[in-house]
């Protein structure tokens, strides 16, 4: 009897240690659940890496060697990019299938559920559910919840790289329901998350379809296909006459600058180079494709001012002017996301100047590849300023700036721009000369306006990506809400006939 009494006391002490005191419990759970610690109901294993100096450990691909990047497989981890030889098996800590793997260094909280035997590197802590206490998939879903993710971040070390060590992992709060309810929770979550997964897949398919259609529409626009019927029914001005007018405008602008220089007592500016129309047209052997007869191939720099000189303007130094940082330029719309204002005196040096109707084109990676481009509309003053990582394109009267905007949004143009970038990794930029020399298919002015009208109409129906992104965000919020309810016992999975969870703890203790 004395021996039995001693066992009973020992069990009570173990229970007391395993259970979370009421005043420390994160939130209220059903009466037949208990709050315990992760390490009480799971074996936690930190991975390790066999020596890279031992070639035999890496010779054959016998055993999956999981690293953080592999965790992107989520609910169904079935392979790893890297494997080890079976001769290294004594040098690693093997993980059975149905293990939940968590990144504990760097991208803390990234999680996957393994459907295969594997091992992992030291950046991963793995949870092996204790038999007849925790249903393995319950671990996976719990770790994905906002509650558990927050715990991990709060308990990680505040160093240059966040680290959640094994000891801290073991102490994390764990809401333990009866075993049968764990299974019902998992079944319901599997069902609901299969629905949200399918919804996300459909959204992704639609996004790809929309993007492909936009690419096709823009391609047809700049080959004259969109306006084929219109062209046959309407007379247009001569495009070559448009090019002639460029020279007239250059000379007029130069004369105005000369008068201003004389007035200011400055040296006259250099006379602009005047080209014959035939010299403005791209040679036939350099033309990317055949255009309609009324169109011509020109270099972008012939019809657009690329990074024009700053304009002198009489503004008080403390006057506020428009300021546009890179983050305020949209990847999908010509409109500025948000207007900022700064004092004129703070922007005169070290920033890029622009005026109304200029186009801002992000020249640095990855902003350029992401499509950051905008048309400047209203300005508080006659000028504004922005990041030095913009190319400024100023349309002349022979080119519609919205047509130019759509040209710059083409996938093909951006791929060419990316290929011609210069600079070191992370700081690669599109050179000014690339912008100036790029071939541009110039239609007659009237046809430009018709192309813009058609594109506005068609692309308005195609620009649904923003709405889809908002829908994706709502699905993400829904998933978080579902998990939140699941681990509070609010998913309708309870059964009063279930054996209380405390009995599970007693069995394993």
Indicate where each model-derived feature is located.
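Non-catalytic DNA-recognition/assembly elements of restriction-modification systems
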Residues: 19-48, 175, 179, 183-186, ...
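A short glycine-rich beta-alpha junction/loop motif
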Residues: 20, 104, 118-126, 136-137, ...
């Amino acid at each position: 009897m004395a021996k039995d009494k001693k066992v009973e006391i020992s069990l009570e002490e173990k229970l007391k240690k395993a259970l979370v005191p009421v005043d420390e419990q994160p939130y209220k759970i059903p009466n037949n659940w208990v709050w315990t610690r992760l390490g009480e109901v799971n074996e936690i294993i930190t991975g390790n890496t066999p020596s890279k100096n031992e070639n035999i450990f890496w010779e054959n691909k016998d055993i999956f060697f999981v690293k953080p990047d592999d965790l992107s497989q989520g609910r169904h981890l079935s392979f790893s990019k890297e494997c080890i030889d079976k001769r290294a098996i004594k040098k690693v800590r093997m993980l059975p299938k149905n293990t939940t793997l968590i990144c504990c260094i760097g991208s803390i909280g990234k999680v996957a559920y393994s459907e295969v035997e594997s091992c992992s590197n030291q950046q991963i802590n793995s949870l092996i559910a204790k038999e007849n206490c925790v249903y393995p998939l319950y671990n996976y879903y719990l770790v994905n919840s906002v509650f558990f993710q927050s715990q991990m971040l709060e308990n990680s070390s505040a160093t240059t790289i966040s680290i959640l060590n094994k000891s801290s992992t073991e102490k994390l709060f764990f809401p333990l329901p009866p075993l049968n309810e764990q299974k019902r929770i998992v079944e319901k979550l599997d069902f609901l998350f299969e629905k949200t997964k399918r919804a996300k897949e459909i959204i992704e398919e639609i996004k790809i379809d929309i993007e492909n259609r936009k690419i096709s529409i823009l391609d047809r626009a700049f080959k004259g296909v969109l306006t084929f019927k219109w062209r046959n029914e309407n007379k247009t001005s001569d495009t070559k006459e448009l090019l002639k007018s460029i020279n007239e405008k250059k000379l007029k602008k130069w004369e105005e600058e000369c008068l201003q220089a004389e007035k200011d007592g400055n040296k006259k500016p250099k006379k602009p180079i005047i080209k014959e129309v035939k010299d403005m047209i791209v040679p036939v052997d350099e033309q990317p494709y055949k255009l309609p007869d009324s169109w011509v191939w020109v270099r972008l720099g012939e019809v657009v001012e690329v990074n024009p000189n700053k304009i002198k303007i009489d503004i008080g130094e403390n006057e506020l002017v428009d300021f546009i940082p890179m983050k305020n330029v949209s990847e999908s719309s010509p409109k500025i996301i948000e207007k900022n204002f700064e004092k004129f005196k703070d922007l005169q040096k070290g920033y890029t100047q622009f005026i109304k109707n200029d186009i801002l084109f992000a020249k640095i990676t990855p902003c350029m590849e992401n499509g950051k481009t905008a048309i400047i509309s209203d300005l508080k003053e006659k000028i504004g300023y922005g990041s030095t990582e913009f190319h400024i394109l100023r349309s002349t009267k022979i080119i519609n700036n919205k047509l130019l905007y759509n040209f710059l949004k083409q996938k093909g143009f951006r791929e060419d721009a990316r290929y011609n970038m210069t600079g070191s990794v992370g700081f690669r930029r599109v050179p000014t000369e690339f912008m100036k020399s790029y071939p541009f298919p110039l239609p007659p002015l009237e046809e430009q306006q018709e192309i813009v009208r058609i594109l506005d109409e068609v692309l308005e129906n195609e620009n649904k990506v923003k709405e889809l992104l908002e829908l994706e965000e709502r699905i993400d919020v829904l998933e978080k809400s579902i998990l939140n309810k699941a681990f509070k016992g609010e998913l309708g999975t309870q059964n009063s006939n279930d054996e209380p969870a405390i009995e599970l703890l007693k069995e394993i203790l």
